[in-house]
Amino acid sequence: MGTTCNVVVLISGSGSNLQALIDSQHEGNPARIRAVIANRADAFGLTRAKGAGIPTAVLDHKAFDGREAFDAALMELIDAHAPDLVLLAGFMRILSPGFVRHYHGRLLNIHPSLLPKYKGLDTHRRALEAGEAEHGCSVHFVTEELDGGPVVLQAA
């Protein structure tokens, strides 16, 4: 990866995780966000990125005939930035096996639960309904199994 780790961040919404990533960019931190890509034009995270001077793009999944066509266009857009890592930060799309394989070993997801508990959606509601005493966040490698890749980091 060299001295700098070029990162492309994918979002769908408010970009609160993106903001934490932006705030962590400082001298001494090798990670550099090179682009933020959203699948929704109304994602507030785009405003956060623009405010930080980070290039943005929108690729609306509804404009494509199926997941594979969208993912192919998304790969082309991502690859134009030559990232070392692709980070899903609230990106609310299930990615095709071909996409996952293309970025194998450099595709990470921020998931709002202590995996392997509460994979998928509605993690906070499910944790509350289960009476969990502890809840947290996981960063994991993306594999073809939904929220099933190796966990890199967890915090409660």
Task: Name every feature range the model reports, one short phrase each.
Residues 52-53, 103:
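Short, structured coil segments at secondary-structure junctions
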Residues 57-62, 110:
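Short beta->alpha connector loops at strand-helix junctions that form conserved
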Residues 1-48:
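N-terminal Rossmann-like dinucleotide-binding module
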Residues 55, 84, 133:
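Residue-level detector of anion-binding/catalytic polar loops
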Residues 24, 31, 39, 89-156:
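Donor/substrate-binding cores of folate-linked one-carbon enzymes
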Residues 38-39, 63, 67-68, 81-97:
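N-terminal glycine-rich "phosphate-gripper" loop used for MgATP/nucleotide binding
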Residues 2-6, 71, 75-76, 80-84, ...:
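Active-site-proximal loop/hinge segments within enzyme catalytic domains
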